[in-house]
């Protein structure tokens, strides 16, 4: 039954590239076959509960701009929010959603009340998933908004905060498992520091390693089959965050022996904040064997902070999904829209329009990347660039020859290499032809 929040808006349909209907897909066709698989199964879109239904439209200089009937800290308001959210999921047609515990339940007086509220909402979600066919891509715990976490959760100097956070994660993993979630995410928004003057760096890293080990142990104990994911971010809200980027996370996982247990959920905007391109982080995660899932959004390149806008840059999406396809595609992961409306976008239909545009943009990027992959448009020039390493001398350099033997061969054969063009402009033009 309709909540009435979205008025008489009908389910979003695919109408093709010529459509001028703002509430229709022009490029995202769930059943279209791309590289032998349905587009929906490639992209595995998810709606973020927090930005879509919990964010109030505030910024550092002003408070709430959105007027939503569920904006109160009451269980009945949380139930109304769930009704509206699942109505939205059904209208949009994305197959997945994601949530933090604090997005879906009221804030209780203590841990027990938080848990009771969460379980009450999970009861509702179970029924709604059965009714709608919606699935949970991942669940997580909000370990950054409440003032108890101002100095971190896993890295807090107070062991009571560590314990409260660990207990909260336990309940959220339970909820995720119960709802059939395919992943569990940890984002350490407060796991970092404002100043080293009051920070024991060694201790905090060890505590963070212990916390993550507890999560992995509990996953196996209860038989949760999903993937544990860390979401890197360099800063904000902390000055420096410990899971800075993919490379940093990999080093952390290696140090604590968790590199085979945990993968990464990579956000476009966080990659930009870390001084990387999105495809760099995806390519590195793929290379290191820890690619898991993505949070899709974009940052304003001039602002210098995390603006969480919906994606609208097709060439960027093509390069991103090219890396996803090279990784073999998603397994348990997917494309979660960690994106929010602008604070002036007040109408309920704006929420649909933002997601529609983002889904169309990703679909165009996927199709372009699939064509590039099929045609060998980028792989053939890459193979040519490194072809020398497939020869006899290249193979001996990598296995067998010592440093003095290499020096001897260079002198004996009068090896005097000349540089070759990297052909960057040619390759960039190829990408532009496909998008």
Swiss-Prot record:
One of its GO terms (cellular component) is cytoplasm. Mg(2+) 1 binds at residues 231, 267, 295, 338. It comes from the Bacteria. The keyword Oxidoreductase does not apply. It catalyses: alpha-D-xylose = alpha-D-xylulofuranose. This is Xylose isomerase. Its cofactor is Mg(2+). It is found in: Cytoplasm. GO terms for biological process: D-xylose metabolic process. Belongs to the xylose isomerase family. Binds 2 magnesium ions per subunit. It is an enzyme of class 5 (isomerase). It comes from Brucella ovis (strain ATCC 25840 / 63/290 / NCTC 10512). Homotetramer. The active site is at residues 100, 103. Keywords: Carbohydrate metabolism, Cytoplasm, Isomerase, Magnesium, Metal-binding, Xylose metabolism. InterPro entries: Xyl_isomerase-like_sf, Xylose_isom_bac, Xylose_isomerase. Its main location: cytoplasm. One of its GO terms (molecular function) is xylose isomerase activity. The gene is xylA. Mg(2+) 2 binds at residues 267, 270, 306, 308. Its EC number is 5.3.1.5.
């Amino acid at each position: 039954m309709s909540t009435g929040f979205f008025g008489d808006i009908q389910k979003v349909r695919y109408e093709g590239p010529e459509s001028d209907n703002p509430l229709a897909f022009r490029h995202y066709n769930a059943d279209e076959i791309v590289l032998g698989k349905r587009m929906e199964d490639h992209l595995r879109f998810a709606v973020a509960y927090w930005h879509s239904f919990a964010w109030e439209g505030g910024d550092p200089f002003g408070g709430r701009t959105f007027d939503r009937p569920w904006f109160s800290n009451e269980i009945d308001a949380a139930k109304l929010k769930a009704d509206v959210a699942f109505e939205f999921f059904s209208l949009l047609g994305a197959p997945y959603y994601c949530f933090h515990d604090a997005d879906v339940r009221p804030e209780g007086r203590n841990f027990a009340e938080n848990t009771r509220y969460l379980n009450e909402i999970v009861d509702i979600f179970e029924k709604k998933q059965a009714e709608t066919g919606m699935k949970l891509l991942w669940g997580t715990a909000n370990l950054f908004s409440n003032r108890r976490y101002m100095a971190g959760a896993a890295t807090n100097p107070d062991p009571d905060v560590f314990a409260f956070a660990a207990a909260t994660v336990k309940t959220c993993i339970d909820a995720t498992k119960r709802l059939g979630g395919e992943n569990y995410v940890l984002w350490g928004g407060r796991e970092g520091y404002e100043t080293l003057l009051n920070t024991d760096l060694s201790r905090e890293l060890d505590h963070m390693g212990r916390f993550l080990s507890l999560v992995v142990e509990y996953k196996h104990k209860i038989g949760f089959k999903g993937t544990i994911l860390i979401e890197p971010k360099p800063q904000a809200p902390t000055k420096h965050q410990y899971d800075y980027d993919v490379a940093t996370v990999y080093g952390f996982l290696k140090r604590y022996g968790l590199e085979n247990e945990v993968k990464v959920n990579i956000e476009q905007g966080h990659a930009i904040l870390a001084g990387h391109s999105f495809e760099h982080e995806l390519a590195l995660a793929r290379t290191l064997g820890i690619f898991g899932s993505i949070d899709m959004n974009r940052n304003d390149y001039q602002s210098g902070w995390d603006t969480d806008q919906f994606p609208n840059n097709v060439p960027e999406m093509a390069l991103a999904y090219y890396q996803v396809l090279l990784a073999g595609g998603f397994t348990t992961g997917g494309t979660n829209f960690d994106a929010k409306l602008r604070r002036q976008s007040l109408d309920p239909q704006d929420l649909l329009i933002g997601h529609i545009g983002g889904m169309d943009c990703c679909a165009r990027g996927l199709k372009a990347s699939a064509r590039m992959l099929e045609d060998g448009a980028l792989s053939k020039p890459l193979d040519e660039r490194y072809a020398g390493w497939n020869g006899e001398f290249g193979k001996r350099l990598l296995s067998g020859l010592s440093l003095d033997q290499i020096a001897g061969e260079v002198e004996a054969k009068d090896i005097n290499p000349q540089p070759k063009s990297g052909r960057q402009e040619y390759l960039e033009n190829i990408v532009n032809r496909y998008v």
